[in-house]
Amino acid sequence: MHTSALVLFSGGQDSTTCLAQALSKYERVETVAFDYGQRHKVELDARLNVLREIKSRFPHWAPKLGEDHLLDLAVLGQVSDTSLTRDVAFKMENSGLPNTFVPGRNLLFLTLAAALAYRRDLQVLVTGVCETDFSGYPDCRDDTIKAMQLALSLGMDKRFLIETPLMWIDKADTWRLAHALGGQALVDLIIEHTHTCYLGDRTHRQAWGYGCGACPACELRARGYERYAAALSKP
């Protein structure tokens, strides 16, 4: 039986929801983030605020929340010419993928997370990737995650489990899951303290949180919140 987990925690809506689920399931939960030269580096500050607020607002989770880790992955920005690591406009590429796709990002994240989990004796890796509401990123697909789980388990001779709580749900359902896990208190925390905007905008407050409201990440989060809120208003 698994008792511990390492959550890949960026400080966004999805990873915060995954962290809440891990805290509801496991006795010991640690977190890890990556500094890869992302334009929205403000998320690295936001995640610390989220961790602080979780400890404050959810005292039953606080004792389970262990060490937080930040890994330097600047080399990823050196090999990736994308709109997440360069000051260029968001657009679709000829490949059919948006230029927000950072090749190899989630593969590297999972590899480094597994190496850290190996050293920390953590049994489960938790990541917020999904196939339902995503931009076609191949490293978010269920087949990719299953292949990574097998490769990491074989390569480190340790049976890892990679959990993807959001794999088959959309953004509206992610809001619903957050409410189911932590009630309105968790929804409010996500609105006020998590960060999604690719441009790093923390000056514009929307109904769903802070962001420019126009980048792909903001649009996806906004649509999900609108559907979630609309369902709540129905008798």
Curated annotation (Swiss-Prot):
One BP annotation, GO: queuosine biosynthetic process
Ligase among keywords: yes
Pathway: Purine metabolism; 7-cyano-7-deazaguanine biosynthesis
Record GO terms (molecular function): ATP binding; ligase activity, forming carbon-nitrogen bonds; zinc ion binding
Binding of ATP, residues: F9, S10, G11, G12, Q13, D14, S15, T16, T17, C18, L19
Catalytic activity line of the entry: 7-carboxy-7-deazaguanine + NH4(+) + ATP = 7-cyano-7-deazaguanine + ADP + phosphate + H2O + H(+)
Obligatory cofactor(s): Zn(2+)
Free-text comment on the cofactor: Binds 1 zinc ion per subunit.
InterPro entries to which the protein is assigned, alphabetical: QueC, Rossmann-like_a/b/a_fold
Keyword Ligase annotated: yes
Key words of the record: ATP-binding, Ligase, Metal-binding, Nucleotide-binding, Queuosine biosynthesis, Zinc
Enzyme kind, highest EC tier: ligase
Binding site for Zn(2+): C197, C212, C215, C218
Xref: SUPFAM superfamilies: Adenine nucleotide alpha hydrolases-like
EC number(s) recorded for this UniProt protein: 6.3.4.20
Cross-referenced PANTHER family: 7-CYANO-7-DEAZAGUANINE SYNTHASE
Family (UniProt): Belongs to the QueC family.
HAMAP family: QueC
Function as written in the Swiss-Prot or TrEMBL entry: Catalyzes the ATP-dependent conversion of 7-carboxy-7-deazaguanine (CDG) to 7-cyano-7-deazaguanine (preQ(0)).
Protein name: 7-cyano-7-deazaguanine synthase
Source organism: Polaromonas sp. (strain JS666 / ATCC BAA-500)
Gene: queC
